[in-house]
Each structure stands twice: as C-alpha cells, then as structure tokens.
Amino acid sequence: MKIGVVGLGFVGLSLTSVLSSKGYDTVGIDINKDKCKKISKGISPFFEPELEKILKNGLKKKLKISNDFSLINNCNFLFVTVGTPQNTNGSIDLSIIKKAISTIGESLKKNKKKPIIFVKSTVTPGTMKKIILPILEKKSNKKAGKDFGLISNPEFLQESSAIKDTKFPHVVVLGGYQTKFMKKAKMFFMKLHPNIPIIITNHETAEMIKYANNSFLATKISFIN
C-alpha cells in the first residue's frame, strides 16, 4: 500500500511522519521546494515534541518528501492536509485547497488503483459536495463512489501533542457515502488505531463535527486566558 499526504504543515507532517514510522510506504508532498529539502534532511520547519525523532525514523524506512505531485499518481490513499486560512471577514479561504484538489484530480487520470481521498483540512459544511467533489470529477473525468472514494476525515490535533494525538486519537471520524471505499477506510483505521472508536457519518456531519470541536477549543482557551 502506498500513501500520499498533500500539504506538509502542522497536521500533514505529523501524519506523514507517524505513518512512515509505522512502516507504510509514504510520500509527503508540498509545493514549497525549500521546505521539502529541509524536511528531507530530518529537520522540521516548526517545533513539535517528538516530531523530528519520528520523522528521522520514517526517512530511514520508506518515506519520501517532494514537491513533485506526480509521485501521488499511484497512491492507494491520499490525505489532503493543506491550510484553509481565514479571510479578513472571517470566512475561509479555499484557494489553496482548490488548487491542491485540482492537481489531485489531474493525477487521478493516471491512477488505476481506485484510490481513497481523505480530506483532513478544515472546511465549512457542504464544501465537500459542492466544491471538492465537482472539481475532482471534472479534472479526472471519473466518478466518486465508482472510480475513487472521497471521505471527510477531520483531525483533532493540538500543538505540543500532535504526535501523540496522531498516534492515539480519541476518535476517528469518517464522513462520506456508504460504499466499498468506506469499508476499506474503516478497516485501515481499525488496523492503524486498534480499540479507538470510529464514527461513520456523511460529509456534512463530519465537517460540522470539526467546526464544533474548534469552537469548543476556542471557548476553552478563552476561559484559560
């Protein structure tokens, strides 16, 4: 099995490092060439406890870091972890994820493995169906549910415990259609995280769960301050 992670920020690099350290054939992709060179040397572009240790362990195994998107052409699983920053008016800027999804859609044309695409980036409810799914189908000329799977897989990491949260999440949320792809995804996470509860729901609910979690954390932080 080959796994690709698109976007090597806080979430993406933590996920890439953990997956590769567990022995998965993993490729981490980022458009920033300088960042990729740094990570390839085992140096994290930001501080996170245990991250560099896990990263170096992965690099000794099957981990590859690159800005070459063609490396995801033959992946079985693809995790999208690019940033979705806020605009000045409080709305989410989807320009980065749209560009990443367009590139992934192009790669689907050459991918004969019927991959599953997991979107971990924070997006507003409805984004998967109204924006991401149409882009993927248009660029790839393939159909979701038949030629590839598309699943919302929100993350719940916190700074200073990202590696721990990636290794031992309190829950795994999978949002999407009840197809063979969902069954395959569930089996993967059951193996990756034994004894961790898995919630299977639709895209919108998975997106909303992420937003509710973010709101809870923001409220918690405000009380601490």
Regions of interest found by a model, annotated:
Residues 80-83, 121, 176:
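Glycine-rich, N-terminal phosphate-binding loop of Rossmann-like dinucleotide-binding domains
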Residues 86-156:
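Rossmann-like NAD(P)(H) cofactor-binding subdomain of soluble oxidoreductases
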Residues 134-151, 157-225:
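Internal alpha-helical scaffold of NAD(P)-dependent oxidoreductase catalytic cores
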Residues 1-43:
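NAD(P)+-binding Rossmann beta1-loop-alpha1 motif at the extreme N-terminus of oxidoreductases
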Residues 25, 31-77, 83-91, 135-142:
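Conserved N-terminal Rossmann-fold NAD(P) cofactor-binding segment
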Residues 19, 41-44, 92-96, 131-134, ...:
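Short, glycine/charged-enriched secondary-structure capping and boundary segments
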